[in-house]
Amino acid sequence: MKDQDKLVSLAAEARKKAHAPYSHFAVGAALLAKSGRIYTGCNVENASYGLSICAERVAVFKAVSEGEREFEAIAVVTENGVTPCGACRQVLMEFGDDIQVIVADTAGHRRAFALTDLLPEGFTPEHLL
C-alpha cells in the first residue's frame, strides 16, 4: 500500500526530532486524516516524567487543532516496532474505531492492526449517552 509506505517514511522522519533524553526511546508518528492530510509527531519527554507526551498524541492533537476529526491510519516507528501505549490507543478511539495502526521498526519490518484489535473494549463517546 502506497499510503503505508509514505506514512512509515514520515513517521521515521518525525522520530528523528524526538526529545527523549531520559528514556532514549525515540518515537515518531504520522497520522492520515480522511481529508488526505498527514500530521506528524514525535515524543517529547520532560524531567517531570508525567508531563511527557507520546508521538501519537502529538500527531492527533496537531490534527485536531487544525480542524480534523476523522482519521484513516497512523504509522508509528520505534527502534523495535512496539505498538502504541494504552493512553494513545484511547485517544485514537475518541475519533473512531476503524483507524488502521501500522507499527514499524528501524530495520523496516512492519505490522498492521485494526485499532479495535489493540483496544477491544475502548471507552467511546457513545458510553456517555
Where are these regions (language model features)?
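Short, surface-exposed loop/turn motifs that are enriched in glycine and acidic residues
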Residues: 1, 20, 48-49
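Short, compositionally biased leader-like segments
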Residues: 1-9, 69, 106-108
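Short, basic/aromatic recognition patches
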Residues: 5-20
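Residue-level detector of intrinsically disordered, flexible termini
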Residues: 10-13, 29, 72, 86
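Short solvent-exposed loop/turn micro-motifs enriched in small/polar/acidic residues
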Residues: 22-24, 85
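Short beta-strand scaffold segments in enzyme catalytic cores
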Residues: 26-33
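Zn2+-dependent cytidine deaminase-like catalytic core
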Residues: 40-127
